[in-house]
Structure formats: C-alpha cells, structure tokens
Amino acid sequence: MENVSTPAVFNLSDLSVEMNSSSRQWSYSEYSEAVAVLLGILMALLVMCIVFGNVLVITAIVRFQRLQTVTNMFITSLACADLVMGLLVVPFGACYILLNTWHFGSFLCEFWTAADVLCVTASIETLCVIALDRYLAITSPLRYPSLLTKRKACVVVVTVWGVAALISFLPIHMKWWVSDEPEALSCLEDAHCCDFNTNAAYAVASSVVSFYIPLAVMAFVYGRVFQEARKQLEKIRGSEGRFHAQMIDNNQGQDGGDGSGGGGGNGKRPKFCLKEHKALKTLGIIMGTFTLCWLPFFVLNVVVTIWKVDNIKMPFRILNWIGYANSAFNPLIYCRSPEFRYAFQEILCLRGAAFPTNGYIYRGHSLRLSPKDKPGSLSNNVGTVELGSLSSVTNINGYCNNPPLASIV
C-alpha cells in the first residue's frame, strides 16, 4: 500500500511498523504457559468436535438414501460451512491467539478473514432457505414436491454460496474494510499482524447484510411456519375429537369391543402429526442456537462503531469464539432424529446389522417389518413409511396429509 504522508511521518511510520513487527515476531504468547496449554487443549478439542461431527453428518446423508431429501441438501450445505469453519477458520485463529503473531503471510491473512465471513454468511443464509423450505412444505403440501425439487435445491445451494462469497471475498480483497486509524494502518503494513480493524461503514454494512437481514427474514418466516403448524394441529385435534365421538355413538348399540380396534388406530394418528411438530422444534433449536451464539458478537460489532470503547479486544475475542463453537453444536442437535442416530451408529459401528424400532428394522437404505409384526398388520393403514423422511409422509386414514417438516425429527 502506498503512503501519501509527508517524509517525516513516513519515516516514523516505517520505524513504528518495524518495531511492531519485531515485537510481534518474538513475542510468542500473551498468556502464561499454563493458560496457553489449557487454551490449546480446549481449542484442539473444539476443532476435533467440529470436524468429526460435521464429517459424520455429511457422511450419513451421502451414504443413506433415506436421508437424501431436499431439506437435508440444505443441512449438508450448513454442515459444509461448519466443516470449513473447523478445518480453516478455527485452527488459524487458535494459532494466532496462542502465538500472538501471524506466521502465514498477508495473502493467507486476507483469505482466512474472508473465509470467516463466508462461513457465517453461508450458514445464516442456509438457515433462511430452510425456513422458506419448511414454509412451502406446510402451506403448500400438495405443490411442494414440484415447487422445490432436488435440482432446484442444488441451484439454491450454489446461489447461497455464491452470494456469501461475493459478500465476503470482494470487500476484503478490495480493501473496503480498512480503517484509517493509525493502529489499523500499522497492522495492515505488518506481515505478522492479522487483526481485522474495520472502518465504521464496513462494520455496519457487513453486519446488516451478512447477519441482521437474514436473521430478520428467518425469524419472520419461521414465525409464520409455527402459526401454520399450530392451525394444522388444532384442525387435527378437532378432527380427532369428532372421529372419537362418532365411534362412541356407533358402538353404543353394538355388542362386543369392535370399537377398540378403531380406538387403537385413532391413537396412532396424532403420533405422525406430532412428529412433524417435533421436527419444527428441532429446526427451531438449530436456528435459535445459531442466533444465541452469533448475535452478541454482531451486536458488539455495531456498538463499538458508534461508541468508542477501550479494552474491547478480549470481549470481542470471547464472543467470536462463542460463535465458532456453534459449528460443533449442530451435529449434536441432529441426534434428535432417529434416522440420524441410527445412521451415526452404523457409521461408527456402534450397533449390530439390525436395529428394531416401532416394528421396523433399519438396514442400511431400507426399512423392513420386524418378524414380530403380523403380515399386513400395518400395510392396510400405512402407504410408505420413512422414519423422519422429508420427501413423503405416512398417511393414515387421510390424516396429516402434508409432507413431514424435516428429517431431523
């Protein structure tokens, strides 16, 4: 970067940069040895959890056909963003903190910073897409399979990553973020400094575009999804009540217990419908966890541009790493899904070849009736059963016709 200052200022600036660079090069840690070791262990564990968990999620979706649904394509995109965070962003960030200096050059510094912004932006945009996907599934259940096919989902995923890359890499490569503060300019000239000292305009604009606008869209759409889900649940309960009352009236003049069989079938209907609402809760946990992890950082990122606050480096660092930790949480949340749990167990060889559940045996890519079930005992009521599948839903006697809300049930 060219310096347009006067010669005297130029010399002082060069001297300052040289001294700062020398001090950074030889000052390997700002923490004591014990604290540095503890931080290193914690950061290494976080990296391993992020990488292991998200590789497990991606492997499960790729390997098991029943997990290869439209919404799970978006889940794969989210896992890829978390995986990049664990492989690239977090390890370099850990080295920078522990060594208190940057050893990887200016190009990797910019690339690392842009990758950080890329992963966060791609994650929240993907969560927005998932919310829109669920809104279409619950409001237009019959048209949903044609509205969002796997091919269209691929286009959406590529678009999300393209927009995220444009938002992250272009401004950083063009140096639109550089602050005119002396400390920021000094760091920019120092090959051993990789602090992201942004100007106020970039800090506000990037926070709004990369976080606040997608967050508002996600919250609004997901609120509408919950409203629609509540309406459907009320309709289902009303239908169940009328059906139960009709069965009682029909059985009053009959001898024997013919109505008991109907009651048993009636008791099964809400389970499939409640399963969809459990899927909504799971998606809500994913979105809520992401918001709780990253919202404090982005609030502080905007606040410090309005009010100058001293000694803000440590709070920034803590909140930033809370955001990083979010990448390790999603695989744990997916364990709410029976199919994901079974897939994880099979990948990790934690169970036998067959795992019976609810009268079904889950073998690789197929679900089969277990021997204890009578032939045809479920075939009369159940069309195609996909535990937690996104692409279709079991329909029992006309109830709960909309497609399931997520495979992460």
UniProtKB/Swiss-Prot annotation:
It comes from the Eukaryota. One of its GO terms (cellular component) is membrane. Disulfide bonds join 109-194, 187-193. Coiled coil: none annotated. A lipid is attached at residue 349 (S-palmitoyl cysteine). It is a multi-pass membrane protein. The chain crosses the membrane at residues 38-61, 75-98, 110-132, 154-177, 200-223, 283-306, 319-337. Highly expressed in the liver and red and white muscle, with lower levels of expression in the gills, heart, kidney and spleen. Gene3D superfamilies: Rhodopsin 7-helix transmembrane proteins. One of its GO terms (biological process) is positive regulation of lipophagy. Belongs to the G-protein coupled receptor 1 family. Adrenergic receptor subfamily. ADRB2 sub-subfamily. Beta-adrenergic receptors mediate the catecholamine-induced activation of adenylate cyclase through the action of G proteins. The beta-2-adrenergic receptor binds epinephrine with an approximately 30-fold greater affinity than it does norepinephrine. This is Beta-2 adrenergic receptor. It comes from Oncorhynchus mykiss.
